[in-house]
């Protein structure tokens, strides 16, 4: 491994003993060998630590560094620690229950060199518990300016994930993952896009994302206070740049607000429980009919869902629920 590897691969580990070795193997099988793997153990209560130690003892690799944090600190803290330790020119953040296809790095770097982009997004395969796969790509293949990518991200037109892309590490100077209970990936990514010159999207599925009920956004109800914190983060990020005063920036923030409350409401419908009615009421009050009408013009699915949430809960439950199940392979 060179003193400065091309890519730092930062992999948080928490309670994934059944999958973490396969995830590590998928990294070590990359056709582009110029990387370092930072395994960030987050106070995992299972035997992940032992399994990783045994595997690396039997298969030593100088490219792998393990950071065993005895106390659980959360996903954002692990990624931030990894960024502090990273030496690579690029970074990526695979989950320890997923897998990179062997050409993940090779193909993403090829397109980075081809376009000069500072971020390259790829498609991914969603792998269901029965082994079936569904390919998913958010965004049309091509290259956007950083500003265009930031607005597209807020409008749910680009992938908000940390694991299906490579990012120039320099974009993280002064940027870290916030301690927010939802969409921390999207928060940091928004800040990176606002700093980037260009962002490329490719339609090659290079990542296998394991769909499991325990890891889904839809397995718990996010407190309304966290949704408000998320939206405040988006607004402050744009306020730090000239994009905040642009009409396109304000429209993107409005659509992000509608989407955030729609998803929060859908969580409440799926999970249920005593808190669900209050959360649903808060989500309905979180945006205006004018907001939903704006979304209807630019992002029709979300605009229509917003109007239904405001006016007809049964229809909202039926139609937006079907959309969520299709998009997230539930």
Residue ranges and their predicted role:
Residues 1-227, 308:
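Nucleotide-sugar donor-binding/catalytic module of glycosyltransferases
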Residues 166, 238-244, 306-313:
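Juxtamembrane/interfacial segments around transmembrane helices
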Residues 257-261:
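TPR repeat positional signature
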Residues 244-255, 296-298, 302-306:
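Structural motif
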Residues 206-212, 219-251, 262-291:
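Catalytic core of nucleotide-sugar-dependent glycosyltransferases
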Residues 2, 75, 103, 116, ...:
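General helical secondary-structure elements
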Residues 269-330:
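Membrane-interface aromatic/basic loop that binds lipid-linked glycans or pyrophosphate carriers
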């Amino acid at each position: 491994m060179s003193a400065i590897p091309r890519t730092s691969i930062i992999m948080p580990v928490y309670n994934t003993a059944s999958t973490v070795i396969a995830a590590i193997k998928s990294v070590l099988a990359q056709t582009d060998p110029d990387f370092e793997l930072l395994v960030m153990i987050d106070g995992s209560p299972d035997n992940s630590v032992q399994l990783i130690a045994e595997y690396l003892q039997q298969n030593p690799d100088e490219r792998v560094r393990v950071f065993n944090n005895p106390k659980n600190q959360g996903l954002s803290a692990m990624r931030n620690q990894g960024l502090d330790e990273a030496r690579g020119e690029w970074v990526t953040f695979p989950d320890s229950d997923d897998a990179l296809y062997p050409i993940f790095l090779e193909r993403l770097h090829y397109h980075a060199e081809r376009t000069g982009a500072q971020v390259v997004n790829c498609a991914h395969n969603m792998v269901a518990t029965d082994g079936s796969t569904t390919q998913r790509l958010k965004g049309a293949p091509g290259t956007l300016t950083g500003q265009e990518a930031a607005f597209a991200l807020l409008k749910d037109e680009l992938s908000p994930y940390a694991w299906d892309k490579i990012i120039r590490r320099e974009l993280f100077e002064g940027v870290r993952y916030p301690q927010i209970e939802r969409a921390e990936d999207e928060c940091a990514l928004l800040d990176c896009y606002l700093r980037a010159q260009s962002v490329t999207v490719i339609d090659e599925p290079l990542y296998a994302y394991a769909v499991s009920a325990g890891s889904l956004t839809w397995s718990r109800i996010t407190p309304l206070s966290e949704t408000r914190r998320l939206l405040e983060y988006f607004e402050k990020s744009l306020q730090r740049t000239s994009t905040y005063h642009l009409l396109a920036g304000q429209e993107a923030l409005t659509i992000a607000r509608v989407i955030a409350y729609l998803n929060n409401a859908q969580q409440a419908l799926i999970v249920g429980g005593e808190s669900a009615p209050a959360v649903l009421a808060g989500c309905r009050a979180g945006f205006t009919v004018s907001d939903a009408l704006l979304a209807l013009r630019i992002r029709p699915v979300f605009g229509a869902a917003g109007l239904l949430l405001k006016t007809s809960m049964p229809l909202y439950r039926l139609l937006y629920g079907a959309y969520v199940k299709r998009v997230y392979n539930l």
